[in-house]
Amino acid sequence: SAIQIVPELARLASSMVVFQRSAPYLIPRANRSYTAAEKRLFSRDPSLMHKLRADLFWTGETNFAQRRNVPRFVREAKDMALSHLHDQVADPALRAKLTPDYEIGCKRVLISSDYYPALTRDNVQLEASALARVEGNTAISADGRRYELDVLVCATGFEATRPPFAKAIHGRQGISLDAHWDQGMQGLDSIAVHGFPNLFIINGPNTGLGHNSVVYIIEAQVDYILDALEHADRHHVAVL
């Protein structure tokens, strides 16, 4: 998505324009290098790494309150995002373009500490409207502004709620998984789907959590699938 590639492209391109359909909320990425002292502690007592991992996990779990729309936690998340914007973008005009006009959580909150700085570079221009059409080498925004381009990069994110593979999978009644989910995505533990025997899905419905690591979810789903396959093998079950 653009949040990932814009900072890298900004370092390479002589000039770049970023088309923005709507401003996202961003929170800082809290990555840092471990100090030499911390590394020595981990080496002497490996259990400290497990404790740190547990602390990070439960810190992430506290963010679930934001997802449940608990007012105090929603307000704290919004304040964090807007403070991050204010700290990284000094130009008030650019900051206004990057300020969302909707409540936090209406679309996925993004995590980056280098996206805003990329947009403040002299060789980067923010077009605060969508790309409407392309005529030859000219990109035209929804507001009618025209930009001559050498390269057009489409970076509109991921189809998290409409997985492309669903069109290729058909169940017992011949209906595709995509059509089955047309009125809403449902699945048992986000893994198995009624009417689609022997189908196991990783990262199925409602597993795209925004408050913690999805790796934990994947590991739990893999355990479920392995247990199901072991049960089928042990009891000679052909269809699950």
Language model segments and positions:
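Rossmann-like dinucleotide-binding core of oxidoreductases
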Residues: 1-90, 124-125, 147, 176, ...
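Core beta-strand elements of the Rossmann-like FAD/NAD(P) dinucleotide-binding domain
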Residues: 142-151, 155
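Hydrophobic, well-ordered secondary-structure elements that form the walls
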Residues: 119, 153, 199, 222
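Flavin (primarily FAD) binding-site architecture
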Residues: 2-5, 154-172
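FAD-binding beta-loop-beta segment adjacent to the flavin cofactor pocket
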Residues: 111-116, 169-200
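Short, surface-exposed acidic
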Residues: 87-100
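Short beta-strand to alpha-helix junction loop
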Residues: 68-77, 102-114
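A conserved short coil-to-beta-strand element within the FAD-binding core of flavoproteins
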Residues: 101-103, 118, 122-142
